[in-house]
Amino acid sequence: MDSARLLVSNAASANSFHRNGHPFSSFAELGKSIALALPQLQDAVLDGEIVCLDRKGRPQFNDLLFKRSQPCFFAFDLLYADGKDFRRDALIERKIELKRFLHRVSSDSRLRYADHVEGSGVALFERVCKIDLEGIVAKYKFGPYGPDGNALSTWYKIRNRNYSQMVGRNELFERDRHKEPVPGWHACELACAEAA
């Protein structure tokens, strides 16, 4: 699934947004579950992916599309937490803070840490294609947070052209497109502004 920004506010609610600002009301229950997993939280903005996993722990887009299992949120970036804006920090520093931040979460939570691999991009991509995953994202580890389509962007999405679950992806996003996008040039900008 395309990246979803997650806004957790006062540990009472969590809202997910598509990167273009459209809210994902389809995942309201996931947001509540995540908010409950962070009882001592003030505010946070996480960037990550909403996925459903099969028995082997692999993402299954069709399960997400047809709500066949409970989704979870894999956080791969921390943009804002407990009053601090991390977007200008290096990715590697944000990952350290994210791991520290998620240490508060119980192991059975639907909020999970998405780890990274350094220096083995080609081998990782070959493995991803072999097990039929969507692709990988390559990021500059010392770069600041830069949303896609922005001059500050320091990452590249590399897609598996033979990914078997590509069909139907837009259908999931269209469910919530009838709603107006949240004002702001980018969902993470809005989320960080609301959290501050």
Task: Label each PLM-derived region with a short phrase.
Residues 1-196:
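Catalytic cores of nucleic-acid ligases and guanylyltransferases
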